[in-house]
UniProtKB/Swiss-Prot annotation:
Annotated signal peptide: 1-26
UniProt name for this protein: DBH-like monooxygenase protein 2 homolog
CDD domains noted in UniProt: DOMON_DOH
KW Signal (keyword) present: yes
Recorded GO CC terms: extracellular space; secretory granule membrane
Cofactor binding description: Binds 2 copper ions per subunit.
Length: 572
């Protein structure tokens, strides 16, 4: 738009040209190339497309209902702070409003309506709403659409009486501006690995493990899609599937971690609030053929808040596979802070940071063949006290990127984050997982552990090409910690931690101590061969703020540039 028009032009031509420019800026994008079902039952479908030049994004929400429907962008997957639109068709016609939520109550109508309704129809029990907005927004009641994955929320009713949505609601994290489209394969085939009528004990926290052989295949297959199969959504907190080494040859079912675990190579992961996961078209999880027939260990974390005994569960995972092999075998690498009870978070902390480091320099120490990691997705994981998770990427001593960020982590909505583009982690790079916790409502120490009331700080990296690698983590060197705090032994240190008067000063001092002391860095392969070395925690930069620029400003600037150009031409 900033290039001057050459040659003589009549007034009529100029007018026609200006009209065509206005039509260019105002035209709607008719294409909706991206599509996601926001719920497991496929009752709610979102289609979208965007135009970065115009700075607009177009949505089409389709819901199997004759009542009201709503869609929103949420900071953390819940109602509070969400940017919401509600619409429908009643006996008076269509209705549509731009709103924001202050809490778990009726969203408030925005003073400025920044969403534009394009069409709204209802037929055969389905309501379809198409609407448009700017990608960026400076309205304090609207959330900007960013290049990072965002938590999308939806709700709907059976009638046009807008009321509380009960169970007809949900959330899904989607990278709207850097979406990786799904593969579409006909005649889909799948197999399940699940518990079979497991009867829960009356424990609040219980980890149950089942080791079983997967189906055998004569030739190599690629798993391209993983779906949760959940019997009791109120009990199942997360699922993990590990591949076992060849030394595991018998099925087994028992409480997890009551004996030495040999199956530790992560193959699949699902967390509460998450949905299905599809691999990019260039990669798939290998199974069968020359990969071998392995046993797999399914781990289910049950969070039985009411301690009810006797409930039966058959939850697990469903794996869609194909004989049409992708270019690469995919793998999952667990990184972050090693889960140990000696790691403690003090009570009364408004913001307490912990760190876990993966130093890829040592991957070749445990593998005969090691490659750079092409990371395409990440799942970040803490428990109830977690508020933020960031994964920093360092090369040659300098931070080059934030591999993944969740500034509004929500324990109830844990999903695999699609990075939108593949990021290369070279051998020798360091990855730093930083978790921020809030323990203001706690009176005692929070330890690292398996219970929901304990804590974790992990990031599962989805990458290719796959390596026989299970973990790359770190933990503070415990002897250094005890010495730095002036405790003679473990017992004295534990007594100090439990009796200390925790305040802002002592909390900050302890946090700095944990960060500055030596760290034990552990890299483990699929056969439990480990490399154990020392390392230090680098400084992680503050996340860059998202710029607040109105789309109309770009539009006005373009018109101004055009008119200045034309004025210059007329004057010459």
């Amino acid at each position: 738009m900033g290039t001057c028009l050459k040659g003589n032009m009549s007034v009529l031509s100029l007018v026609l040209f200006l009209l065509s420019v206005q039509q260019f800026w105002a035209q709607e994008d008719p294409l909706l190339p991206f599509s996601e079902h926001l719920d497991l039952e496929h009752n709610v479908q979102l289609k979208w497309g965007f135009d970065k030049i115009q700075g607009t994004i177009l949505f089409q929400l389709s819901v199997n209902t004759s009542g009201w429907i709503s869609f929103g962008l949420s900071p953390n997957g819940g109602m509070t702070g969400a940017d919401i639109v509600i619409g429908g068709v009643d006996n008076k016609g269509t209705y549509f409003t731009d709103r924001h939520a202050l809490g778990n109550s009726m969203p408030v109508v925005d003073q400025k309506q920044n969403y534009k309704l394009l069409s709204l129809s209802e037929s055969d029990g389905k309501t379809v709403m198409k609407f448009q907005r700017s990608i960026e927004s400076c309205d304090e009641n609207d959330l900007p659409v960013t290049i990072l994955p965002m938590k999308l929320i939806y709700a709907y009713g059976e009638t046009d009486d807008i009321s509380y949505h009960k169970a007809q609601r949900g959330t899904k994290e989607v990278n709207l501006l850097k979406y990786m489209p799904r593969a579409s394969l006909s005649n889909a085939t799948y197999f399940d690995i699940t518990m079979e009528n497991f009867m829960l004990p009356a424990n609040q926290t219980y980890y149950h493990c089942k080791t079983a052989r997967a189906p055998t295949f004569d030739s190599k297959q690629h798993i391209y899609r993983i779906e949760p199969v959940i019997t009791n959504y109120d009990l199942v907190h997360h699922l993990l599937l590990y591949r076992c080494p060849p030394t595991v040859t018998e099925p087994l079912e028992l409480e997890c971690y009551t004996k030495t675990e040999r199956c530790m190579e992560t193959i699949a992961v699902w967390g509460v609030g998450g949905g299905d996961f599809e691999f990019p078209e260039v990669a798939g999880l290998p199974i069968g053929g020359n990969v071998g027939d392995f046993f797999y260990r399914l781990e289910v974390h049950y969070n039985n808040v009411n301690k009810t005994a006797g409930r039966v569960d058959s939850s697990g995972l469903r794996f869609y596979y194909t004989s049409k092999l992708r270019q690469h075998d995919a793998g999952i690498l667990m990184t972050g802070l090693a889960v140990i009870p000696s790691y403690a978070i003090p009570p009364k902390a408004k913001s307490f940071l912990t760190y876990g480091m993966c130093d890829t320099t040592y991957i070749p120490k445990v593998l005969e063949t090691a490659n750079d990691l092409q990371v395409f997705s990440v799942m970040m994981h803490t428990h109830l006290a977690g508020r933020k998770v960031r994964v920093g990427h360092f090369r040659e001593g300098k931070q080059i990127d934030l591999l993944a960020v969740d500034e509004n982590y929500n324990f109830e909505f844990q999903q695999v984050t699609n990075l939108g583009k593949t990021k290369t982690v070279k051998l020798g790079d360091k990855l730093l997982v930083e978790c921020t916790y809030n323990t203001e409502n706690r009176n005692t120490l929070t330890q690292g552990g398996l219970s929901t009331s304990d804590e974790m700080c992990l990031a599962f990296l989805f990458y290719y090409p796959a390596m026989n690698l299970s973990g790359c983590e770190s933990l503070p060197h415990f002897s250094s910690l005890v010495s730095e705090m002036g405790a003679g032994d473990t017992g004295t240190w534990l007594y100090m931690m439990n009796t200390m008067a925790w305040n802002d000063s002592s909390i900050n001092e302890y946090q700095q101590t944990l960060k500055k002391i030596n760290q034990t860095v552990i890299v483990v392969n699929s056969f439990n061969k480990a490399s154990i070395t020392n390392g230090t925690i680098p400084d992680l930069k503050v996340s860059p703020p998202e710029p607040c620029v109105r789309a109309c400003a770009t539009k006005n600037l373009a018109f101004m540039s055009l008119f200045l150009c034309l004025a210059g031409m007329w004057a010459s």
